[in-house]
């Protein structure tokens, strides 16, 4: 993305370096187009930034990055810890090309116990509040649902929506199969239900032994009072809990909330496997693959530290933080310590630093982190402890159960990385096959950009177009776009295709033309960086889900915009719409191609086409459902957002509102009898 402060004047580093202070802070490098190249943190800004421009033995990639620097910005902080926090925020926000970057996943699922008189268990994603109880985060939706099933089996807490709970007149099926105590119909008192909720919360917090002891005491008390049915119910609850504890690996101890981090590097890629233990229960794991890792690690290996500045510079490089390049002396020490393994270890430690900073700063962090490699940062752990409000311990060589967990995490990281490398090899082969099939010449196949369009509607209703993007040998979901199609005859797919292609590429063509005009006015010969970036947004291949008719519409649009029609390829479905029978139709008059089921090129085309279809149809269905679910209530006179929300909550949805009588409608807060009659008339 181009910054509004694109640089047009020559860059003179000496003047800038002379003005830098000997203070901690964060520095940012920008290119001529205003795009950020790198974000780093330094104990001494002057020493750190100067090291990039005073060394002569730089690796080719680093030398290339330095030549692209056109502007330097610095921010002074009060401490190195503040610099670390600011660096982490900027890396997430700017996604620099030469920093290790993990996808910022803020949607970890939680298990929620609501603040209702009879609390409900629920799967939850989003920001947490203080009103309800939240347990987690969990590594996956499956882990949350498994925990809910366990709590249903042992403590029989309800999972129904409040609107359903408030309107039940008899127990549901879950009560009949022993998964709910039916508080909706008064089958259990509020006090007894509160005890079950408390036991469930303690179970999730890892205090299983307390729960078992109290249940045992309760069972004996019922037996002493000759209440044998109640005693048998508690005995069954204890049996279910004992079965759960036996089936799962449970760690007994005060610090039963643990995260296990295993890092594996292989084949130029790195995997971080995060396993979560909550309440002593292993909840599963999740694999992360950082972006920009190749450039960032090459930067780290290239020797951009501060050894020229003496001992202080060496100390700073030894404590290099996530995304910050290590110095040549540190690299030399690594190589001397172990010719075979030290380099890999430094790479993995660098990635682990980046992951810990980006994953935990500003989020919940457990008291114990078990790691496969020792992070290089000395300030990171202190900052995590300060933000969490409790001490965060790092365990490098665990024992017992934790050692088994770390071993399992390392094995899963290796398996995930091997699977990724295998898939990448297959995808690269498919990309190469497609380029050869279409006679497309490309020096770097990773830069081959393919966009695919599809139209979806239901009998002309809720028409939507999708655009999916493929480059670097994989689908780029962050670049997908949906387009609401309006102003056409319902069901006219040709008009819809014309509209989406025009909206997609008209602005890109204008941006490229403006960049070229600006360069011409500035007297720049050849293609500048600004013009190259504008042109790079245009795809190399455009796939159209359709036959000759759709391709002809696309050809007309591209001709009007002055674009090359040879990049247009239609994907016509074969007999029975079976994969492998498609025909590729070209806009420039080439003979249509039938590649056959075994063609690697056709496999890639089908993959991209199917993804465009999926993305279009899910968007269309959501749009259609929203229109059908809410339109009738939104059209009611005298019903605003609050009253509409109360009606839906009271009757459980639009169908319940339609089925309600005038008296039932009038019983809702804010609905008078006259307004209830008006609502009833408008709905019937």
From Swiss-Prot:
Domain UVR residues, every copy: 209-244
Compartment(s) where it occurs, according to its Swiss-Prot or TrEMBL record: Cytoplasm
Recorded superkingdom: Bacteria
GO biological process: nucleotide-excision repair; SOS response
Primary location recorded for the protein, binned into one broad class: cytoplasm
Record field: transmembrane: none
Record-given protein name: UvrABC system protein C
């Amino acid at each position: 993305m181009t910054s509004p402060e694109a640089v047009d004047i020559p860059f003179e580093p000496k003047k800038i370096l002379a003005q830098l202070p000997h203070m901690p802070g964060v520095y940012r490098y920008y290119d001529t187009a205003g795009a950020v190249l790198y974000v780093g943190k330094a104990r001494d800004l002057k020493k750190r930034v100067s090291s990039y421009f005073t060394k002569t033995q730089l690796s080719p990639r680093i030398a290339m990055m330095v030549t692209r620097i056109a502007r330097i910005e610095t921010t002074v902080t009060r401490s190195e810890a503040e610099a670390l926090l600011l660096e982490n925020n900027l890396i997430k926000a700017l996604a620099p090309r030469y920093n290790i970057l993990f996808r910022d996943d803020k949607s970890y699922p939680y298990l929620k116990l609501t603040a209702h008189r009879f609390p409900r268990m629920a799967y939850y994603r989003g920001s947490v509040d203080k009103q309800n109880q939240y347990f987690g985060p969990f590594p996956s939706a499956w882990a949350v649902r498994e925990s809910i099933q366990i709590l249903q089996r042992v403590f029989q807490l309800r999972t129904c929506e409040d609107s359903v709970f408030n309107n039940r007149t008899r127990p549901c099926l879950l009560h009949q199969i022993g998964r709910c105590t039916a508080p909706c119909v008064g089958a259990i008192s509020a006090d007894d239900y509160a005890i079950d909720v408390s036991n469930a919360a303690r179970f999730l917090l890892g205090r299983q032994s307390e729960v078992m002891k109290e249940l045992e005491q309760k069972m004996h008390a019922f037996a002493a009072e000759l209440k044998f049915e109640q005693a048998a119910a508690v005995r069954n609850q204890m049996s279910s809990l004992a079965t759960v504890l036996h089936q799962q690996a449970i760690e007994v101890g005060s610090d039963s909330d643990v995260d296990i981090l295993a890092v594996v590097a292989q084949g130029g890629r790195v995997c971080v496997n995060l396993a979560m233990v909550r309440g002593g229960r292993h909840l599963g794991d999740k694999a992360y693959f950082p972006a920009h890792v190749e450039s960032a690690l090459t930067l780290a290996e290239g020797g951009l530290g501060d050894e020229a500045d003496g001992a202080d510079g060496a100390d700073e490089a030894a404590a290099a933080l996530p995304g910050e390049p290590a110095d040549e002396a540190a690299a030399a020490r690594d190589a001397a310590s172990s010719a075979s393994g030290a380099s890999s270890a430094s790479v993995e430690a660098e990635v682990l630093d980046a992951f810990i900073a980006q994953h935990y700063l500003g989020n919940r962090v457990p008291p114990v982190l078990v790691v496969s490699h020792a992070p290089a940062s000395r300030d990171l752990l202190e900052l995590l402890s300060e933000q969490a409000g409790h001490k965060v311990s790092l365990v490098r060589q665990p024992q017992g159960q934790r050692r088994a967990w770390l071993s399992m995490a390392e094995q899963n990281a290796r398996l995930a990385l091997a699977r990724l490398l295998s898939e990448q090899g297959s995808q690269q082969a498919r990309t190469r096959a497609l380029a050869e099939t279409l006679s497309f010449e490309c020096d770097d196949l990773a830069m081959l950009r393919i966009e695919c369009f599809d139209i979806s509607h239901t009998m002309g209703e809720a028409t939507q177009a999708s655009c999916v993007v493929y480059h670097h040998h994989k689908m780029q979901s962050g670049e997908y776009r949906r387009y609401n199609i309006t102003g056409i005859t319902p069901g006219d797919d040709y008009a819809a295709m014309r509209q989406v292609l025009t909206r997609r590429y008209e602005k890109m063509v204008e941006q490229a033309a403006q960049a070229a005009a600006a360069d011409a006015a500035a007297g720049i010969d050849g293609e500048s960086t600004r013009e190259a970036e504008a042109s790079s947004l245009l795809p190399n291949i455009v796939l159209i889900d359709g036959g000759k008719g759709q391709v002809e519409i696309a050809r007309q649009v591209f001709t009007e915009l002055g674009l090359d029609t040879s990049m247009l390829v239609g994907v016509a479905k074969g007999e029975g719409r079976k994969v492998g029978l498609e025909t590729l139709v070209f806009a420039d008059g080439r003979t249509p191609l039938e590649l056959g089921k075994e063609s690697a090129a056709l496999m890639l085309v089908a993959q991209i086409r199917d993804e465009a279809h999926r993305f279009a149809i899910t968007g269309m269905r959501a749009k259609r459902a929203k229109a059908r679910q809410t339109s009738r209530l939104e059209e009611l006179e005298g019903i605003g957002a609050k009253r509409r929300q109360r009606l839906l909550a009271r009757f459980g949805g639009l169908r319940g509102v339609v089925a309600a009588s005038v008296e039932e409608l009038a019983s809702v807060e804010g609905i008078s009898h006259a307004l209830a009659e008006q609502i009833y008339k408008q709905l019937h």
